[in-house]
Amino acid sequence: MGTHVTLGLDADLLASGIPSKIRWDYSRYPHLVVFGATGSGKTYFTRLLLAKIGKWVPHAQICVCDFKGDEDFAFLSGCPDFFRFERCSEGLEAAVKKLEARQNGADPSRSFYLLFFDEWAAYLNYLDKKAAEEAKRRLSVLLMLGRSFNIHVLISQQRVDAVYFNAARDNFSVIIGLGRLSREAVNMMFSDFREEIK
């Protein structure tokens, strides 16, 4: 398996009868962001990806922060690394503490660790301004330093405006847009490919 997780199949090649896998090499491209309008399949995709990580990445630890707090991740209730709604701050803190423990040598392991945050933008909008800025700062540290310690971030939300990530948005090396994307979203996240995306 190495350091790869299959994300899906190449649609163009599949249309020609060639099932070619699209893989995420998390050692080279540590962080992912998934975005799309309501009903675009973000939750389905992220649940499938988390299941693949759990099955195929040895000793993976996944911290799930479900700010939406509906039934999509309710099956995780009771799990120690599952945080809903207001408790998502605890999940973010746990990920930062994991990074700090690996930095200072208290945790010498380098096993795969993923912070998954569903509806990051809604979470920030829920917080007061000072708390939101602190949350963005903490996420930025994970995005900028996590790769060296095998710590990864997966964010799922409707829009990926820079305001939600400070200067760290460019640290998302895998960007997945689902559903019918607006021209603005295409220009913002896929400017190099905007002519190819219809």
List the model feature ranges, each with a label.
Residues 45:
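Hydrophobic positions on the alpha1 helix immediately C-terminal to the Walker A/P-loop
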Residues 157-198:
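Conserved ATP-driven motor cores of ASCE-family P-loop NTPases powering translocation/secretion/packaging/pilus
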Residues 91-103, 134-158, 181-182:
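Substrate-engagement module of ASCE P-loop NTPases
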Residues 1-21:
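N-terminal pre-Walker A segment at the start of P-loop NTPase domains
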Residues 59-61, 110-114, 146-155:
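Loop/turn-to-beta-strand initiation segments
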Residues 42:
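Conserved lysine of the Walker
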Residues 61-64, 68-117:
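Mechanochemical coupling/switch segment within NTP-driven translocation systems
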Residues 37-38:
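The conserved Walker
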